[in-house]
Amino acid sequence: MRRVVYAASSSAYGDRPYSAKRECDPLAPLSPYAAAKLASEHYCHAFYRTYGLETVCLRYFNVFGPRQDPNSPYSAVIPLFITKLLSGVRPTVFGDGGQSRDFTYIDNIVHGNLLAADASGAAGQVINVAMGPSYTLLELLAALNSLLGTNVQPLHAPARVGDV
């Protein structure tokens, strides 16, 4: 095996007040999931430094697209919102809806993985895979309402612990 490409997560950044994230930014995971993803990045670096195994950690940002589990409460906000809107059911927004997301289409994730597998100079690196710009959940909901020709308002619930 020449190189391992690891599926890391933007959740490693935690809840930063700025939307653009850079690989050199401070890390502050807020959930066990985020901490586990970051710990795995450290394992990748350790294997690279200790054994020379080439590793590349790709930090994915809110992946969406075909074959996504529409029932996942954390990673499927787009299909979940669409299903609710088409059914006339108010989608739940945790918190005030001002939390922002950089939604990245699955084809871009696949392309990033293929590039990381062969790119010279990528070994030992952490690379963000995102599209930019970020959208708040309320902006996403408004855009989906517009595209679908619906006008369903969200139901707000308390913010989830560890949600960024």
Protein language model annotation of sequence segments:
Residues 1-63, 146:
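N-terminal Rossmann-like NAD(P)+-binding domain of SDR-like oxidoreductases, especially those catalyzing
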Residues 9-15, 62-68, 98, 118, ...:
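Active-site proximal helix/loop that lines the substrate pocket
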Residues 18-22, 71-75, 106-108, 142-144:
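Short, glycine/charged-enriched secondary-structure capping and boundary segments
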Residues 25, 30-41, 72-79, 102-103, ...:
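Short-chain dehydrogenase/reductase
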Residues 45, 79-83, 114:
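Solvent-exposed, non-membrane alpha-helical residues enriched in polar/charged side chains
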Residues 86-164:
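C-terminal substrate-binding subdomain of Rossmann-fold SDR/epimerase-dehydratase oxidoreductases
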